[in-house]
């Protein structure tokens, strides 16, 4: 009997992908560019466009970065799908991490390919200082990376206990 692989976690990628694109659609249909609605004393919904990567990295570099980030998202996603295929379904933390990163990377890639930029809208701030605006895909990627870090500590502990 063939054992189940980590590919069974790709549903999580699909959920992250759909939620991200749906929230971006809602923002673009209901907000003008840079329009901001205060939700909490430290949080706004603000429609912003990002042609770069996280924190607008490479945003002002003439357009080549669009293709670079599309290629990067495809390569990273392909590698992570390969790793999911090799993993056992029992590796829940690692598989969840890979799936979240794939969903977030592909959602931002789709946005970038369609619009030429990524739609961001979560705007946290304190007084005059604003954290860079981000989206659901960014959250999925960061949570995925956090789960990988947690998994590495758990596996490191497990290996240390086995010795």
Curated annotation (Swiss-Prot):
Annotated keywords: Aspartyl protease, Cell inner membrane, Cell membrane, Hydrolase, Membrane, Protease, Transmembrane, Transmembrane helix
EC numbers listed for it are 3.4.23.36
Query: Which residues are annotated as active site?
Result: 120, 138
- What InterPro entries does the record tag this protein with? Peptidase_A8
What membrane topology was assigned to this protein in its record? Multi-pass membrane protein
Quote the Pfam families the UniProt record gives.
Peptidase_A8
Query: Could you mention a single GO BP entry for this protein?
Result: proteolysis
Q: What is its main location?
A: membrane
| A GO term from the CC aspect | plasma membrane
Q: Where in or outside the cell?
A: Cell inner membrane
Q: In which pathway does it act?
A: Protein modification; lipoprotein biosynthesis (signal peptide cleavage)
Spell out where the chain crosses the membrane: 7-27, 64-84, 99-119, 133-153
Protease is among the record's keywords: yes
- One term of GO molecular function: aspartic-type endopeptidase activity
Per the record, what are the reactions this protein catalyses? Answer: Release of signal peptides from bacterial membrane prolipoproteins. Hydrolyzes -Xaa-Yaa-Zaa-|-(S,diacylglyceryl)Cys-, in which Xaa is hydrophobic (preferably Leu), and Yaa (Ala or Ser) and Zaa (Gly or Ala) have small, neutral side chains
| Known function | This protein specifically catalyzes the removal of signal peptides from prolipoproteins.
| Similarity section | Belongs to the peptidase A8 family.
| Protein name listed in UniProt | Lipoprotein signal peptidase
